[in-house]
UniProtKB/Swiss-Prot annotation:
EC supergroup of this enzyme: oxidoreductase
GO CC annotation terms, alphabetical: membrane
Glycosylation site positions: 60
Family to which this protein belongs: Belongs to the cytochrome P450 family.
Extent of the signal sequence: none
Protein name: Geissoschizine oxidase
Amino acid sequence: MEFSFSSPALYIVYFLLFFVVRQLLKPKSKKKLPPGPRTLPLIGNLHQLSGPLPHRTLKNLSDKHGPLMHVKMGERSAIIVSDARMAKIVLHNNGLAVADRSVNTVASIMTYNSLGVTFAQYGDYLTKLRQIYTLELLSQKKVRSFYSCFEDELDTFVKSIKSNVGQPMVLYEKASAYLYATICRTIFGSVCKEKEKMIKIVKKTSLLSGTPLRLEDLFPSMSIFCRFSKTLNQLRGLLQEMDDILEEIIVEREKASEVSKEAKDDEDMLSVLLRHKWYNPSGAKFRITNADIKAIIFELILAATLSVADVTEWAMVEILRDPKSLKKVYEEVRGICKEKKRVTGYDVEKMEFMRLCVKESTRIHPAAPLLVPRECREDFEVDGYTVPKGAWVITNCWAVQMDPTVWPEPEKFDPERYIRNPMDFYGSNFELIPFGTGRRGCPGILYGVTNAEFMLAAMFYHFDWEIADGKKPEEIDLTEDFGAGCIMKYPLKLVPHLVND
């Protein structure tokens, strides 16, 4: 094969030369880093992290090297946290030092260069947005105000399942349709005329961003060679389509009605955001812009659909596989909703055992087994080791929640363990952190989990269930697939049988 100066191989040669020279000139650090596996030149530990399920790979390495582990991912240093004690020390005791986000290339594109809550850097901007989220957009009072919306869409969800009575259906698809409908209604108030376009964009975006870390994230020195990636250009195109749709919706809303200065009980999320844009009721140093609003809406749609569908599917699997839990859930749900036409939000609040099942499922199958990476803002010490400024801090919450010293028989689905040992997953118990904790904990836990509980309650009230293809529950394939989250590699197929019409 003829070699030419336009060959990509030349870029690789340039990079290798640049990297070698840079490493030779780089002063040796005297910091005592946490223990970890031996590294190779150039790639660090990437050869040991290349498996399909990184949370399991990292746990195996942490079992050898300790719950605070250093790995080299290309040019980047990463500190891996793998037990509850280290999670508390790093994420709570040193919470301010690790309050920044590590922003990868894909995230930067999808968030208008780190706008919104998920990838914003720590400071006044993030503080203001989290206040809006926790006090107005996703507070307990606000989520309860959405119950009528959830109940309406639950009717459609149940009707959709009825159309499959006696026939196989894919649960993830049914759950996703319900979740897209509810998040669009809670954001925009009425049924969004562009909903179908938005759903297509979200699905395509999810597929393209399924592997969040790219070569340029691991080797920043190579970023100049990667900026013209086909995948990144496709992502930019999709985000521009979403931007056009959201901009039109915002402009139409502002033209159609005067934005209220006072908060209202029945206002949708867009109304809340526009009120903060126009009137800045919190008195912050700055007002949010249309770009902020669009970034927030997009992250809300992504978080409220994909991860919640995962939570619902895994919970359904675990309940069906455990005859004792299945019997108790059926009895509880049908006892509370006896002779009713529909399940209501206040019914769901009474379903204590079913909600324990959801909690236990998120322990075994967290939607994000590796919490969104943080970035260290300053050096700090843990047990004599230095967590260096600029390092990624990655919490393996799956490993934390599989610790046999905390959770007897950790891989066993046992909802009753929370009766014996009450703890919640809102971030104060470091043994159970499927949604993160502290300054970077997920502000939408209540909204997401409530929607999962609504769907499960409706499914167990209206239908009996069997596994498709004549399989027994214990024969369900639990193989995981890792992308934007941890999903079932083979989607759950069920056959519904109508009980309460």
